[in-house]
UniProtKB/Swiss-Prot annotation:
Pfam families, A to Z: Glucokinase
Catalysis: reaction(s): D-glucose + ATP = D-glucose 6-phosphate + ADP + H(+)
Location in or out of the cell: Cytoplasm
Record carries keyword Kinase: yes
Domain of life of the organism encoding this protein: Bacteria
Protein name per its UniProtKB record: Glucokinase
């Protein structure tokens, strides 16, 4: 008889839940709920379990916020809870709450070739460190290392490191944004809101008044080639993505590969392929050759957060991935 665990991927807007076959890691019965419709995460979980009529005693939920102890307060939502209390209330034997990019990193060993698009570099070196990052509402970052037959995720808040310009244009962008918001982190330019910041700074650098555009507007106009400013912003976004990815590769010697997740890049995939991303990734001066063979992959799996939550839980329960 198949034994299932509950897995989840929860952001500021939606909560996606599914079942994970503990033996195989296969994800099934995925369903997305609007967070605004429920008073708590526990309430959403109860609705899901009632709908699917499956006995579940183990669970792992990935959440887009730092996890530092028993009490979890979501960054972009009003939900807050005690992990121990929710575990008790649900009658679970085991409940893990992990960072969303911990989950994405743990999905990487489970991915197949059809879930990946490669952008340069050679083949990954087995057993070497891995980096994963992704732009969405914010900029998530994690590393993954293989130690004693186990995968160990190293999450953090790497999206909040300083934005490090490496061209005259980027330096002007930094100057304009610093005057507006003070500290300029990488997330301030590599995210949905970050794309808007790039567009606004590009226009303001020419002493013009920017339009009130959303990320979707900028992307659409750039792809339609109907707005030079939007196209410049999207091109610069791709270049800075490359620089940031190259920095991650240098930090930990990620010869196991650098992986891109998040919902933004797939929306302009062909544009990204033709952009200066890879050249910027390798633009490391004396260490250009060091990063030259490090492969970069775009993750195109539908549910990497669910897949990784399942992998994390299965490994915790003693399975070898």
């Amino acid at each position: 008889m198949t034994k299932y665990a509950l897995v989840g991927d929860v952001g500021g807007t939606n909560a996606r839940l599914a079942l994970c076959d503990i033996a195989s890691g296969e994800i099934s019965q995925a369903k997305t709920y609007s967070g605004l419709d429920y008073p708590s995460l526990e309430a959403v979980i109860r609705v899901y379990l009632e709908e699917h009529k499956v006995e579940v005693k183990d669970g792992c939920i990935a959440i887009a916020c730092p996890i530092t102890g028993d009490w979890v307060a979501m960054t972009n939502h009003t939900w807050a809870f005690s992990i121990a209390e929710m575990k008790k209330n649900l009658g679970f034997s085991h409940l893990e709450i992990i960072n969303d990019f911990t989950a994405v990193s743990m999905a990487i060993p489970m991915l197949k070739k059809e879930h990946l698009i490669q952008f340069g570099g050679a083949e990954p070196v087995e057993g070497k460190p891995i980096a994963v990052y992704g732009a969405g509402t914010g900029l998530g970052v994690a590393h993954l290392v293989h130690v004693d037959k186990r995968w160990v995720s190293l999450p953090g808040e790497g999206g909040h490191v300083d934005f490090a310009p490496n061209s005259e244009e980027e330096a002007i962008i930094l100057e304009i944004l610093r005057a507006e918001i003070g500290h300029v982190s990488a997330e301030r330019v590599l995210s949905g809101p970050g794309l808007v910041n790039l567009y606004r700074a590009i226009v303001k650098a020419d002493n013009r008044l920017p339009e009130n555009l959303k990320p979707k507007d900028i992307t659409e106009r750039a792809l339609a080639d109907s707005c030079t400013d939007c196209r410049r912003a999207l091109s610069l976004f791709c270049v800075i993505m490359g620089r940031f990815g190259g920095n991650l590769a240098l930090n930990l010697g990620t010869f196991g590969g650098v992986f891109i997740a998040g919902g933004i890049v797939p929306r302009f995939l062909e544009f990204f392929k033709a952009s200066g991303f890879r050249a910027a990734f390798e633009d490391k001066g004396r260490f250009k050759e060091y990063v030259h063979d490090i492969p970069v992959y775009l993750i195109v799996h539908d549910y990497p957060g669910l897949l990784g939550s399942g992998a994390h839980l299965r490994q915790t329960l003693g399975h070898i991935l």
